[in-house]
Amino acid sequence: LKVEKKSHIVGKGGRKMSEKPKYYITTAIAYTSGKPHIGNTYEIVLADAIARYKRSQGYDVFFQTGTDEHGQKIELKAEEAGITPKEFVDNVSTEIKRIWDLMDTSYDKFIRTTDEDHEKQVKKIFKKLYDKGDIYKGHYEGMYCTPCESFFTESQLVDGKCPDCGRPVQPAKEEAYFFKMSKYADRLIEHINTHPEFIQPVARKNEMMNNFLLPGLQDLCVSRTSFKWGIPVDFDPKHVVYVWLDALTNYITGIGYDADGNSTEQFNKLWPADLHLIGKDIIRFHTIYWPIFLMALDLPLPKQVFGHPWLLQGDGKMSKSKGNVLYADELVDFFGVDAVRYFVLHEMPFENDGVISWELMVERLNSDLANTLGNLVNRTVSMTNKYF
């Protein structure tokens, strides 16, 4: 009998990677503008459920999450709080990680965009794209939504407001670097048409094709000079890298990508990602900007981007200004972590928004867990005692 010893790939951080089929799943990294509510927390719970299921099927799962920590909004929030941006994001990132741990999520990597290795690679990626001719210097003049960290033309606004969040936008005029989006548009359209599973659900794919790709892409502003809290452009340090170029690259920097060609074995095994699980409000960044950046870097695209719906309060999307926010730790204190996980996974369809409230949680948990499951367990125990 010949016994073969299985070899392992040792990934970044010393994590052994087995010969089992890999499954790389990510959430969007949470923006560190404040404490996440249950609507934000839903995504990490869903990703965790998928990761656990894939592990049970025999996959070697790598599950990455983390925090997005740069941008104008962060700089303004820190100024309001009277502390430095780094102190502000340290506090918020710690709180986000605490809640992810409270929800018993089994992530393998928690990346921060202020991590030294991430910042180093973002600088190298920007320079690589510039040297390739995909990034050029110009002047930006248009509208900017600070909460979304997004640029818009006048024609893209809805009633003069941000088409994504509905908030007011501000005029912006500054020197900036731009990425040649149109250079890769036809290639991306072809990829979407030949890979129907790439953008899911189908409604999200249709939205991206009809509203953005088919009408034609404009070049994207990928640097800012009107604020300082960001990763500086190495060869032009008065510019900081646009927050979405910074944030999106976490999916490759977190597993060992190196723009100079010295990527880790872990990266070579894990990439492309099997699933990017994100909210429907950021689908454009992940299915247009991100794949085009990857094409420019000569990297394969993720296998699937799934834009999940929102978890709403009874009167609409959760908002601190509306006073309708529910926090995960408050719900866990009252119901327990497993009950909260059960509710958000049960109540969220994949096509439409779900609704959460204290009343709905009590009703669902009493109906399903206390009554149905409780009755089943009681009958099973009674029969076991009686007949065995």
Predicted regions and their residues:
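Short, charge-patterned binding micro-sites
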Residues: T67-K73
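Polybasic, lysine-rich low-complexity intrinsically disordered segments
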Residues: K2-S7, K12, K16
